[in-house]
């Protein structure tokens, strides 16, 4: 008996037919005193090309303290018969109490009024005050200057941008410390080896303390610590829907899909901020340091780099994928572009042949939080008080390429085998050394999967891979790689690989 015949027998013996399927998705996000609700309704049920159930609509209810069990259990928000009404544009429901737990249910019904009461159609929300920024990446658009769209509280903002000339500079658009907690919490410090803050640096001249007069230790190689910049706690939510990759950034955890991998310690605790090195790593007395006025450490194995970083103290290590991914997302958020060189500055990106081609640390002691050069000027840039693109690849923890698959881990402990990592199941394809054309997003971040773009389309950065070994990721690019630099991903090197254009940084 065919599926349709069996279904027809059931229908013939059921007065109201069968109930619709579960909703495809119900997304409920907290608001200050309310909730933002989006519903992807079920499709009609079709078996053997025969229509079995027509979805007429769904009933939205909300209930305090417990999930609605039926279509009459709770407060009716709306009975929706325009099925796509809240698929893309959210329903804003107000009048709720912050800190109180509510449950929102969407009960689909057929054209006979038969409801689906499955518990899978329910979502929990706790309203609270928050700041939420975001953007989506239109995957159908290859233009790096139009594919990013602002949403949420930054929907009407003007983006930041490097000053596109030979003298350099930066414009901050609508973004400011007054409206953005990320900028407010981004501050330069001298930090002791035990992880405690010693003192704050002048924001426009790191050679001075915050008073702008007293000399700092930013160039003092004997200082028992490093120059570091804080990034305040950011909760991130990533998801893909209708050829759009959504990136949301919040100052609080609005729902369980918001995570803070870049701020999570090995014991699972979440820090109120993380420290990023202000300078590329230099090797001083067997410690990987962030100190101005030094040459970059190069030609070391990854194992040595990790050891030198940990020699600073128990909490130190080289960089890691979750913080690099977050930095790349913030570059996109602030500049509304996926062309990192045009938007943030080119960096020391071309003409390099040996270690003396690399920029010395502390080249941009002045100029403020952001600085860069346009017009393909070959000078390093600065983002959130941290010098970037100084000429060498940055080796990081947390991203391996094992048997041709990306393996990722957001927090310590890390290893070189992929044990305990998440196998994303994703691979890079195309000609190694080409420009990134396609990237797939998971909850952990974005992973290049197809090469074949160009320097001014899609993501404008390069990708390298080797599926025949266990590769330890390098990111950013080097001054040997020209326009491929920026957000480049290189999973083409064993952890033992050394070169004049590979370095690392100490993170805390």
Model-assigned labels for residue ranges:
Residues 42-75:
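Solvent-exposed loop/turn segments flanking beta-strands in beta-repeat/beta-sandwich domains
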Residues 93-116:
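Beta-strand-rich modules
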Residues 128-256:
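N-terminal module-boundary/linker segments of secreted carbohydrate-active enzymes
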Residues 133-137, 325, 346-365, 388-389, ...:
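C-terminal, surface-exposed recognition/capping segments
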Residues 218-225, 252-389:
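Short aromatic-cysteine micro-motif
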């Amino acid at each position: 008996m065919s599926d349709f015949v069996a279904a027809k027998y059931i229908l013939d013996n059921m007065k109201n037919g069968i109930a619709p399927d579960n909703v495809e998705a119900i997304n409920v996000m907290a608001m200050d005193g309310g909730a933002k609700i989006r519903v992807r309704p079920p499709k009609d049920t079709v078996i053997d090309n025969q229509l079995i159930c027509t979805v007429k609509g769904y009933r939205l209810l909300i209930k305090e303290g417990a999930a609605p069990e039926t279509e009459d259990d709770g407060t009716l928000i709306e009975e929706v018969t325009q099925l796509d009404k809240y698929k893309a544009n959210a329903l804003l429901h107000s009048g709720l109490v912050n800190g109180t737990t509510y449950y929102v249910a969407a009960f689909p019904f057929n054209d006979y009024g038969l409801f689906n009461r499955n518990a899978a159609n329910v979502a929990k929300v706790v309203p609270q005050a928050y700041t939420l920024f975001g953007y989506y990446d239109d995957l159908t658009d290859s233009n790096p200057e139009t594919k990013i769209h602002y949403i949420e509280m930054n929907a009407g903002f003007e983006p930041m941008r490097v000053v596109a000339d030979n003298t350099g500079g930066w414009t901050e658009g609508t973004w400011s410390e007054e409206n953005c907690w990320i900028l407010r919490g981004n501050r330069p410090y001298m930090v002791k080896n035990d992880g405690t803050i010693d003192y704050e640096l002048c924001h426009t001249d790191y050679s001075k303390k915050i008073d702008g007069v007293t000399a700092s230790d930013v160039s003092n190689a004997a200082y028992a610590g490093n120059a570091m910049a804080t990034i305040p706690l950011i909760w991130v939510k990533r998801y893909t829907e209708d050829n759009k990759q959504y990136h949301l950034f919040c100052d609080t955890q609005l729902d369980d899909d918001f995570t803070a991998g870049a701020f999570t310690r090995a014991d699972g605790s979440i820090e109120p901020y993380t420290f990023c090195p202000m300078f590329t790593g230099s090797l001083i007395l067997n410690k990987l340091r962030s100190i101005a006025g030094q040459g970059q450490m190069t030609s070391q194995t990854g194992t040595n780099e990790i050891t030198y970083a940990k020699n600073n103290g128990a909490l130190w290590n080289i960089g890691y994928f979750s913080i690099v991914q977050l930095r790349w997302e913030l570059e996109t958020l602030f500049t509304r572009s996926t062309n990192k060189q045009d938007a943030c500055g080119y960096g020391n990106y071309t003409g390099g042949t040996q270690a003396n081609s690399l920029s010395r640390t502390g080249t941009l002691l002045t100029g403020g939080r952001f600085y860069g050069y346009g017009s393909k000027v070959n000078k390093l840039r600065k983002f959130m008080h941290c010098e970037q693109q100084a000429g060498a690849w940055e080796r990081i923890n947390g991203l391996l390429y094992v048997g041709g698959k990306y393996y990722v881990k957001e927090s310590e402990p890390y290893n070189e085998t992929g044990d305990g990592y998440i196998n994303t199941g994703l691979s890079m394809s195309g000609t190694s050394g080409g420009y990134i054309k396609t990237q797939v997003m998971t909850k952990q971040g974005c992973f290049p999967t197809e090469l074949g773009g160009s320097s001014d389309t899609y993501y404008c950065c390069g990708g390298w891979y080797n599926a025949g070994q266990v590769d330890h990721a390098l990111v950013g690019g080097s001054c040997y790689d020209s326009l491929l630099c920026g957000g480049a991903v290189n999973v083409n090197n064993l952890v033992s690989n050394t070169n004049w254009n590979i370095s690392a940084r100490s993170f805390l």
